[in-house]
């Protein structure tokens, strides 16, 4: 017969497991495990296909295990502990942020939740309007109402956001170009992105010409300006070439 202590043990273990589980950064741990499993699978396949070199590979593998094994046993928990520490810091930051968020912002959030809750009521009212006036008239009236209400705010938001977005894009591009192999990948990806941007611009322009007012919310991608910005950035980051004197 199980004692009271035995029955309580799973509960204690579960509590410990919950404490060990990361609250915010669990996706980092999951990604690391996934990467490790993929690497192990690739390594195992490569070793199986190494043919005559397999004994040499296994010999090197054994030597590496002999040297690295003690170091791994000593330090393998360090990354996990660092991740736990960072997770706690994130938790503290979120708690502090929640404490400092102005009541007005929380009120707006509550209003958004209330709006989501009354969405079914709005949907029923809309269905009634469709039955009364027809699909086309109802949709047209809604589009005009939404357009007149949100067009100024949308354009102002885009005008303020666009320069910051360009600045962030250039900064990210500069950092990515410092990574190994990225410039080579970019030579393939950039022309594709440029082609997609041109197709997008062409589609928006043609839709506007046909009278689709929704295209007013779809700003064109400034391909020429982006090309100019990245061309200047590339010129600034290119290494200087030194030629020997004759």
From Swiss-Prot:
**What cellular-component terms does GO give this entry?**
lipid droplet; plant-type vacuole
Source organism (scientific name): Arabidopsis thaliana
Q: Which domain of life is it from?
A: Eukaryota
Write down what this protein is called: REF/SRPP-like protein At3g05500
The UniProt similarity line reads: Belongs to the REF/SRPP family.
Q: Which residues carry this modification: N-acetylalanine?
A: 2
- A single BP term in Gene Ontology: lipid droplet organization
Whether Nucleus counts among this entry's keywords is no
| Keyword terms of this UniProt record | Acetylation
Q: Does the keyword Acetylation apply?
A: yes
Q: Where are the transmembrane segments?
A: none
């Amino acid at each position: 017969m199980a004692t009271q202590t035995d029955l309580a043990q799973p509960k204690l273990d579960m509590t410990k497991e919950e404490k060990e589980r990361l609250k915010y950064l669990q996706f980092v741990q999951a990604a690391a495990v996934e990467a490790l499993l993929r690497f192990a699978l690739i390594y195992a396949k490569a070793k199986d296909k190494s043919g005559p070199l397999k004994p040499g590979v296994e010999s090197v593998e054994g030597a590496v295990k002999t040297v690295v094994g003690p170091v791994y046993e000593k330090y393998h928990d360090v990354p996990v502990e660092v991740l736990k520490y960072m997770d706690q810091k994130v938790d503290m930051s979120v708690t502090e942020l929640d404490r400092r968020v102005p009541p007005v912002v929380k009120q707006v959030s509550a209003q958004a939740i209330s709006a989501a809750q009354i969405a079914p009521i709005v949907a029923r009212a809309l269905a009634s309007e469709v039955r009364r006036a027809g699909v086309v008239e109802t949709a047209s009236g809604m589009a005009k109402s939404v357009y007149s209400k949100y067009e100024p705010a949308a354009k102002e938001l885009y005008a303020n956001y666009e320069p910051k977005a360009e600045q962030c894009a250039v900064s990210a591009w500069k950092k990515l170009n410092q990574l190994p192999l990225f410039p080579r990948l970019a030579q393939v990806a950039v022309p594709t992105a440029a082609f997609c941007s041109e197709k997008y611009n062409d589609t928006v322009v043609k839709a506007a010409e046909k009278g689709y007012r929704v295209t007013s919310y779809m700003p064109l991608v400034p391909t020429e300006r982006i090309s100019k910005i990245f061309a200047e950035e590339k010129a600034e980051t290119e290494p200087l070439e030194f030629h020997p004197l004759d």
